[in-house]
Amino acid sequence: MQGAITVDPERRFLRFRFDQGATVRDWVEAQAIFLQFSEETGIRRALVDVRNQPLAGPVMQLFEFGHNIPSGMVFAVLSDPHSEDHKFVETVALNRGKSVRLFFGSEDEAVEWLMAEAI
């Protein structure tokens, strides 16, 4: 995976930070790690930082990723406001009732929403 994963032990969420060259494949790999970690720890919230990743992949891969975002989990995504890839994935996920939201401002706002969102 092109990026880093850390745990916020106090607030109990995973933080994913993707590098500029990351693709949808890296997202899928991170998702598998998150699902495994969630099963082991019960953590079901993630802060995902894709601000340095303007492009992620072909539309079909983006659609499949958005479609396959797990239910019963919450994802706050720090994004670049000019990334159509990120907006597309959010739209696909929201249309399927997933708890995902893009944030273009401060990380604090994203974390606040992440912690307030019901699971």
Where does each model-flagged region fall?
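Amphipathic, Lys/Arg-enriched alpha-helical "gate/interface" segment within cytosolic domains
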Residues: 1-119
